[in-house]
Amino acid sequence: MNMKTLTETSTFRVLSLLLCFCFFIPAMNVSASSLQADKFKVSGIVKDATGEPVIGASVVEKGTTNGTVTDLDGNFNLSVASNSTIVISFIGYSDQEFHISKDNMILNVNLKEDTEMIDEVVVVGYGVQKKENLTGSVAAVNFKDVASMPVANTANMLQGRLPGVMLTNNGAQAGHDSPEIRIRGVGTFEHNDPMVLIDGVESSVSQIAEIPADDIESVSVLKDAASASIYGVRAANGVILVTTKRGGEQKPTITYSGSIALQEATVLPDYVNSYEWAKMYNECWPSKAYTDDMLQKLQNGSDPDHFANTNWAKEMFRTAAMHQHHLSVNGGSKAVHYMISTQYFQQDGILRETANQRFNFRSNLDAQLGIVKLGLNLSGSRQNIDEPTTSVTGEGLMRYLTWFTRPTVPVRYSNGHYGFLDGNPNISQSVFKNPIEALNMGYKDNKHYRFDGKFFGEIDIMKGLKFRSSLAYKYYMNDVTTFNPKNNVRYDAEGNALTTVGTNKLTDYHYLETTYINENILTYDFSVGKHSFNLLAGHSIQATRWDKNEASKQGFATDNIYEMDGGTMNDHVTGSAEESSLQSFFGRLNYNYGGRYLLEMNVRHDGSSRMPKAHRYATFPSFSGAWIMTNEKFMENVKFLHSLKLRGSWGKLGNQEIGNYAYAATLAASGSYYFGDSKQIGMKTAKIPNENIKWETTTITDFGFDAAFWGGKINVTFDWYEKNTSDILMKLAMPGIFLGSLDAPYQNAGKVRNRGWELAANYFDQKGDWAWQAGFSLSGVKNEITDMKGVEDISNNTINREGEAIGSYYGLKAIGIYRTQADLDRVNANGQKILQNNQEPQLGDIMYEDIDNNGNINDADRTVIGNPFPKMQYSFNLGFSYKDFDVNTFWQGIAGVYRYNWDETTISKGGNKTSRWLDRWSESNPDGSMPRLGGTINNNYSSFWLTKGDYLRLKNLEIGYTFRQREFLTKLGVQSLRLYLAGTNLLTFTSLDDYDPEKLSTDSRNDVHPNTRTYSFGVNVKF
């Protein structure tokens, strides 16, 4: 394993700063008691709720660092200042405060259990439940633990925090860094994103990014059918519930949090210099070779205009700043509660000429008017994204690096023009693309506007019986203006024009999405003896409309006109609109017998406009139960076991994500119909319908347990599950005579199984001024296609095939490199000499297995060579605090996974080469780890290019100090002040060189924007 980041100078600087911070802040903590002349000696004993002595309870003079801990008998002695207050605390119990006077110097303290910990609740579908009463598999994140992470996208804070939830950052381009989230594997061939609800309103993963972390109270993930089936047809991929903060009955509290951060790429490719690159090019193209004189100039740098040494990755990327400022006010009376917040966020991208700016606001209001409760949630955001007119990923700027640039060309010539040629006259400028020119050429303004509103009313009809009705409205608009200039003539180093003036073009894109949601829910809670019941019945209806419009025009007089009326030629306008609606009836029954036996039943009946009338409605039930063993009498004497709950569940879910009109015969306008001698506008069939399609259905079986040991200091959760998806909608191959030029229609044909396990454990303890915590999570899943009606779906380097995982890697099986004559003379089982594409292989070529045993390596020898699913994902956290000083670390990683690290071996269009190619095969280096350069046979997708993608990453490190109730702060009206240093992705251990190991399996060519490493300083102030 290679430790990639520790040796970087910037990291050393930051770690040094962290150490200085550790020693400097505690030194500022001058005890207020040291300034007091009069002292009282206080003594006492601390007992728990059962009368047993509490060992290690913290006894601290409030507002100071003067403190002690109770001994083995629960006793303590402490000298304090006159007229002071002491605070006594212990894990699992509520803090207690005592005012010290001459008449109150001996204390007998009985701690009371912390009811918030006992009654810890978790947000579930359409409500909350006590954690101890959950029968399904629900994981939750308290955002107090992660809110200070210096990330641009709030969703990234969830990475590694939830077992069974895999979050992958596929690049960190400013404004385009929404991660991929998969819950318990991949269940279908398309559309595997989970359902997301923010304060009960359906949203998306990308919208989580727009919520300031300081606004979020908690995030719950519903992983099994028992917990998710209440959402029916949208819940097959799991459900993420985001709950924002609300006000309470308290005086107004103003909170400010701000941070400033520096970002840099986690890793940039280690490209060879121009001299080494030119030698590689000569091996591939001897007819276009760099001469000895040219090579000499590349070595000595004597002619930088014609023989440069450019590191294009370092020219494209930079260290960039990021800062955010969040202000909130919350409070309320008995009748009215409020929480109002706003945030400003500014990020300069590490890719030059990119940036992301966002403004957010949120207002959550609650009013209690007798038996009626009213609420109003309002939130909105405005986001401006600066980006180049050329795309960054895919075939954009990142592809330029790997395929179309070479280090022998300068960024700019000395005459100021962008570089496109070097001094080798045999290489055309047409194969070169200058990414720095692309970053600076043209104009692109990408604006996003979002507004969400929800009004709800709730009435207490009678004891335990409530009715709640809500109306929500969602508005999202995206406007993109792109201008490509005409003044993009290419020149050589002497100023000669290589191309002519082009035609400029302005494109305006407009997208609008609006949604209305109405929900009506009736709940009834009642008990009969030891029998407790909770009933829920509801109805929901929602409608969504999407509008898209795009217009473009060319022929503008100058490159400074960004209005459509300024164009003179090639008008082009397109537009479309779609609508969908969903109606649902749902219900839930919770039964609790004596706090020991739990039963839950859910059912949802969904009707979707996306399905044909014959299959428009479907029902999705679930059943779950649990046994809390530790509430049984026979477990009373098992002292070390605080709680033990066994769980089991089964349920059915659905998936409607196939587009809005998959079953219908849609039409499209066309101007290609002739009547007489002229073309006329007409209508044509856009796709072939299938009125027999129905829901994709997922059933999940889950067994697990939740256990707590030694008074709740250690908590363990385990789950085993099997998730089977059937009737998967896919496009089966059909005869071309039937399809014509259209795609095949969707049919219900596939089946997929995901079988996996999850384990999580956490430990927390406290002794006096010291507290520490540790935890870990492990999970694994095996994905398998169990039925595809005998059809195979091959796409580039992946395949969907029965018995294999979705998106399995498909290519030739590499068994080495031809290094000797004996290798060249190898034969197959039939004694045939093995050719490659009917040609004799050469020394240095990659050697492939002859799968079909016909003596010739070609596409027929492709086979499954791996799959994109890791065998295990894991995380662990370690942290401690001493008085007001705290340190927390969080590590995350995956194991047992392979990623493509493919590279073009012919250098046909130029393209930078990484340093691994310095160890390529050659006559002077016959044992090289890389094949020879040149020869298209080595370009084949094969297992040779699969690299172990395991990694372990220090995802977050935070060191902080909190000033509480200091005299100098109290005078300023400050309740508390926290200063902290934090970093993300500080260390990475991996065997994958040159590229970040945290990437999607679909990134076979390393065309993705790098991820970022971040260093930040932050402050939290509460008034």
Q: Which functions belong to the PLM regions below?
A:
Residues 264, 268-294, 381-426, 482-484, ...:
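A surface-exposed, glycine/aromatic-enriched loop/edge motif typical of exported proteins
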Residues 286, 298, 303, 484-492, ...:
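Surface-exposed, extracytoplasmic segments of Gram-negative outer-membrane nutrient-acquisition systems
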Residues 1-362, 366-368, 372-381, 392-393, ...:
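Short, small/polar-rich motifs associated with maturation and membrane association
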Residues 46, 61, 69, 195, ...:
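Hydrophobic beta-strand positions
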Residues 242, 855-860, 959, 1019:
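Residue-level detector of buried hydrophobic side-chain packing
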Residues 146, 186, 193, 320-323, ...:
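Extracellular/periplasmic, surface-exposed regions of secreted and cell-surface proteins
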